[in-house]
Amino acid sequence: MSDPIVLLHAFPVDSRMWDGVRPALGERMITPDLPGFGSAPPVDEPDLGLAAAAVLDHLDRLGIERAIVGGCSMGGYVAMALLRVAPARVSGLVLVNTKASADTEEARRNRFAMAARAESAGIGWLADEMLTTLLGRTTLEKRPEVEVTLRELIAGQKPAAVAWAQRAMAGRPDSFDVLRGAGAELPALIVRGAEDALIPRAEADLMAGALPRSTVVELAGAGHLAPLEIPAEFAAAVSRWP
């Protein structure tokens, strides 16, 4: 596909997580910051639909009517929220280390607790708490530069954005209806890191089942942030598709 490709970042980082992918995908890439992260202004209501609306506004300003829309983790949730409200503008999906299912009650409680902690204590603790779940064991053992980059990305975010995102993700709906509604016609690439400690392989398989034109790629040696951990391999998977 030669369409522009929108890649939406994971939590709790910003669009710089895609910098290593840019040399391979080049000018096709559009990587906006989601509300409150990086240079993006915040929104008040904790709703990923508002993040999707912000992405659509960004595409409008660029004069782009249709694009491949993708994202990693939280970015994948926003991509599916965008597909829900504007399916005609999505020519393909790239879903990376993400899932279409809603949170469990336990996961929601954990998100609300993290939001409250970020608001009361800042986010100086966040990198230490999340590092071993965000990065795969191979990265933790053999790619110290990725850990340094991730710590810098997390430290650069605002506590209010962290709190907003956690509450917004807690409130997101199940998106399998959206995938099934678009699936017969929509090409999709589903990518997961083989060492992802947060989202199991079964979630990728469930999304693939809802998207008949999907391709599933598992990247060895990567965890939950595969595009940051092994950007060349991720870019190659995108370039080979569909």
Language-model features: locations:
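Short beta-strand element of the alpha/beta-hydrolase
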Residues: 3-10
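Active-site glycine-rich loops that stabilize anionic/oxyanionic intermediates
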Residues: 10-13, 73
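Active-site loop/oxyanion-hole signature of alpha/beta-hydrolase fold enzymes
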Residues: 16-23, 28-70, 81-86, 236
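Short beta-strand immediately N-terminal to the catalytic nucleophile in serine-hydrolase-like folds
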Residues: 69-71, 96, 191
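Flexible "cap/lid" loop of the alpha/beta hydrolase fold
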Residues: 80-85, 89-129, 133-134
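Conserved alpha/beta-hydrolase catalytic His-Asp/Glu region
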Residues: 103-107, 121-182
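Conserved serine/cysteine hydrolase catalytic core
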Residues: 156-209, 218-220
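Catalytic histidine-centered segment of alpha/beta-hydrolase-like enzymes
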Residues: 219-235
